[in-house]
């Protein structure tokens, strides 16, 4: 392995255009893998992770960091194909970046690149991505999503203020119910499944 400074100098020469070219090559490789699999329906998991750093590297900031609270870090947004266990795309952000920042744009890029390769895409995300802009991006392209909703007090109130929920047994020990509601500041109601 070369000295870290050599790698750092090499990576320092990358421009936005260079990194975008690398991301495009990655999409082409993933599409070949997807075409070879002949899958017509896929689940894409969107998530972020923290990369700890020591010192004051460019682009780092103090943010959510469960391993080393108060330490500077990067926050990396990534997308994986569940069926193929394969990385699709991602990018690194400053450590103090909110989880959902850039996710709608990344999802739009995924859709643009994979639209001709699969019939159905279901995007799966945790509550950090419970954002109407993300949902509108997915719905606008005609795809599906599963996003864990944040348990805001006003949403929980809406669950119990309206008509009683019709609960159905699920998985021998759980019950589920459906409700359509519009979270505050959202343009229209959405379907929620309560477990």
Q: What is each PLM-predicted segment?
A:
Residues 38-41, 74, 86, 117-119, ...:
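Short coil/turn connectors at secondary-structure junctions
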Residues 66-116:
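Electropositive, glycine- and tryptophan-enriched low-complexity nucleic-acid-binding patches
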Residues 97-154:
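Domain-level cores of phosphate- or acyl-group-handling catalytic modules
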Residues 144-195:
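An anionic, glycine-rich sequence signature occurring as long contiguous blocks
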Residues 48-50, 81, 89-94, 127, ...:
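Short, structured patches in soluble enzyme cores that scaffold and shape functional sites
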Residues 4-78:
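Active-site-proximal, Lys/Arg-enriched surface segment
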Residues 1-3, 7, 40-51, 85, ...:
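Short, conserved catalytic/metal-binding motifs centered on acidic residues
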Residues 54-59, 88-92, 132-138, 156-161:
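Short acidic, glycine/serine/threonine-rich loops at helix termini
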């Amino acid at each position: 392995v070369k000295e870290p400074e050599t790698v750092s100098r090499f990576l320092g020469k990358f421009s936005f255009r260079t990194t975008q070219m690398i991301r495009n090559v990655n999409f082409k490789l993933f599409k070949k893998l997807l075409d070879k699999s002949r899958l017509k329906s896929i689940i894409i998991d969107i998530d972020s992770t923290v990369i700890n750093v020591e010192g004051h590297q460019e682009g780092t900031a103090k943010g959510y960091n469960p391993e080393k609270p108060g330490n500077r870090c990067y926050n990396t947004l990534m997308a994986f194909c569940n069926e193929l266990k394969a990385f699709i795309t991602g990018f690194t952000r400053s450590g103090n970046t909110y989880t959902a920042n850039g996710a709608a744009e990344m999802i739009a890029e995924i859709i643009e690149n994979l639209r001709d390769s699969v019939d159905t895409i279901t995007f799966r995300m945790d509550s950090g991505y419970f954002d109407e802009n993300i949902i509108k991006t997915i719905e606008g392209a005609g795809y599906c999503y599963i996003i864990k909703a944040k348990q805001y007090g006003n949403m929980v109130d809406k669950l119990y203020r309206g008509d009683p929920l019709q609960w159905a047994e699920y998985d021998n020990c759980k019950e589920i119910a459906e409700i359509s509601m519009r979270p505050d500041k959202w343009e229209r109601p959405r379907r929620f499944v309560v477990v």
